[in-house]
Amino acid sequence: MESALALPRLPPHDPGTPVLSVVDMHTGGEPLRIVLAGCPEVSGPTLLAKRRYMRQHLDHVRRRLMFEPRGHRDMYGAVLVPSELPDAHLGVLFLHNEGYSSMCGHAVLALGRFALDFGLVPATPAGTREARVNIHCPCGLVTAFVACEDGRSHGPVRFHSVPAFVLATDLMVDVPGHGKVVVDIAYGGAFYAFVTAEKLGLDICSAKTRDLVDAASAVTKAVKAQFKINHPDSEDLAFLYGTILTDGKDAYTKEPTTNICVFADEQVDRSPTGSGVIARIALQYHKGLLELNQTRAFKSSATGSVFTGKAVREAKCGDFKAVIVEVSGQAHYTGTASFIVEDDDPLRDGFLLK
């Protein structure tokens, strides 16, 4: 017999106490906390301006929701904002333990479901099997295609990326503790360094997570110190987000290739990393290892979850040859929550432990 305790909607608190309401989801094990209410208005004429405004004026919201005691070191979040693009159904700012990302594929897969289920897109006609959701991310407009039935999300989601391109290949980077390491850098809405884990003395499938994190973080720091990242469209996008360690299986095969992404402040992605899949597909296509519309499966070494990806057409990003990549995966709801922030709480803005 289940026990039940009658509780008020929220614990007793002062009427002026801030309340942050969220929906929690995950995609392949990677969390997404979507803010429904409680975040003050994010000002700015463009999405990138809103991102700067939130970083400068509302960062306490990020810390309260991402950090302990309400979150944890590897929590990920999304604040929905209006977009200046006429075709966008919604704009989104991505939150993590260090700040604000420019792109997040696992979040786009989850937000596709969320947008349909919460009425952020027009109702789909009877018999529609797939709904289209245009999501304005800081890197640009991406289009999600949400499997649906009777107007509700049902099953996997796929999306088409912004133009993805390769910034550098076979870059020799001096990584402390590892010597000279060959690194590729590619962009999938965010810039990543790619290294075969074996080159760092690690087995991507059996190594301890801590060892993978330490190695990836060392690569990220070394690349940031020795190589300048540039983006043809905006300086706001010109930063290295993290390092993805791979099993080195870049040539086309129907078997999954395994990787793990360490981004921001040593945050570990539980999923195969949607924007990382985009960048890795762009890298494989650039090297002639993959043709258009050849689907590859990407497996997370953290959870075993799988995304699929394929380059669907060629494009340009500034002077860079690029591709549009389709990524597919499945997101799930995990719950809802309302968090309060009491003025006399010395830890009200959160904390992190390493």
From Swiss-Prot:
Active-site residues from the entry: 104
UniProt-listed Enzyme Commission number(s): 4.2.1.77
Residues holding substrate: 105-106, 269, 274-275
Alphabetically ordered keywords of this record: Lyase
Claim: Lyase is one of the keywords in the record: yes
EC supergroup of this enzyme: lyase
SUPFAM superfamilies: Diaminopimelate epimerase-like
Pfam families: Pro_racemase (PF05544)
Reaction(s) catalysed (UniProt annotation): trans-3-hydroxy-L-proline = 1-pyrroline-2-carboxylate + H2O
Entry GO MF terms: hydro-lyase activity; trans-L-3-hydroxyproline dehydratase activity
Keyword Lyase tagged: yes
PANTHER family named among the record's database cross-references: TRANS-3-HYDROXY-L-PROLINE DEHYDRATASE (PTHR33442:SF1)
Miscellaneous: In contrast to the T.cruzi proline racemase enzyme, lacks the conserved Cys at position 273 which is replaced by a Thr residue, transforming the racemase activity into dehydratase activity.
Stated role: Catalyzes the dehydration of trans-3-hydroxy-L-proline to delta-1-pyrroline-2-carboxylate (Pyr2C).
Entry's family note: Belongs to the proline racemase family.
Assembly with partners or alone: Homodimer.
This protein's name: Trans-L-3-hydroxyproline dehydratase
Species, as recorded: Pongo abelii
